[in-house]
Amino acid sequence: MLTILKLGGSILSDKNVPYSIKWDNLERIAMEIKNALDYYKNQNKEIKLILVHGGGAFGHPVAKKYLKIEDGKKIFINMEKGFWEIQRAMRRFNNIIIDTLQSYDIPAVSIQPSSFVVFGDKLIFDTSAIKEMLKRNLVPVIHGDIVIDDKNGYRIISGDDIVPYLANELKADLILYATDVDGVLIDNKPIKRIDKNNIYKILNYLSGSNSIDVTGGMKYKIDMIRKNKCRGFVFNGNKANNIYKALLGEVEGTEIDFSE
């Protein structure tokens, strides 16, 4: 079984405090991932795991230094230095996460998109190395990054850009979105399940003026699970044991199921 776990929201860092780390959360999440991997091993069950995280308090403040608005569009400037500096900030964040995972004996390995991802008419992402890592029971840890855009020079790709691409290319069985809310919220309450019977009602609600999409991309998350015809959860990664439960497919939150 291939599972993709996206760590997002304010789980790992505070975007309002540059270069901050929520150490208690990071340590807890590493422990829960380790416990889940041990569970599968003890049950003689196979799990292949990919972790994805965003820029957090590291990538965002640096990227802002090299962005300006011109004719209503965001463009990058001074990228002879900026590309390296954004790349370095993301690598620094990723290294902290990798080091913590490794301290719990999780075979985590870093994947830096800027070295092999190109954006043109579509995202071009060579997944051959990731496939080989998964065959060897390694845990690839991939992050949002600055990449080459063959039309516009440069582009930031987020964790939410990476997850659906990998899910489609690698045929993921389970997509997990660890956010800072309790699931897909309707009237401030998490809906238990989204499937073919209520998907359009939910999407219409999230498009309406009464909806507050606190994660900034809840519709996108739901739609990616639907398009990839798999099962997923949107849940609160700040709550103890939720990462562990999610990896076992039983977390409290919103279950989204379009598996066939």
Curated annotation (Swiss-Prot):
Activity over temperature: Retains 38% activity when incubated at 100 degrees Celsius for 10 minutes.
Consequence recorded when altering residue 156 to G: Confers low activity with farnesyl phosphate
Catalysed transformations (reactions): isopentenyl phosphate + ATP = isopentenyl diphosphate + ADP
Field pH dependence: Optimum pH is 7-9.
Annotated keywords: ATP-binding, Isoprene biosynthesis, Kinase, Nucleotide-binding, Transferase
Residue numbers binding substrate: 55, 60, 159
GO cellular component, one term: cytosol
One biological process term in Gene Ontology: terpenoid biosynthetic process
InterPro entries per the UniProt record, alphabetical: AceGlu_kinase-like_sf (IPR036393), Asp/Glu/Uridylate_kinase (IPR001048), Fosfomycin_R_FomA-type (IPR024192), Glu/AcGlu_kinase (IPR001057)
One Pfam short name: AA_kinase
Origin: domain of life: Archaea
UniProt-listed Enzyme Commission number(s): 2.7.4.26
Any GO MF annotation of the entry: ATP binding
The protein's assembly and partners: Homodimer.
Chain's role: Catalyzes the formation of isopentenyl diphosphate (IPP), the building block of all isoprenoids. Has no activity with farnesyl phosphate.
Protein family: Belongs to the isopentenyl phosphate kinase family.
Name listed for the protein in its UniProt record: Isopentenyl phosphate kinase
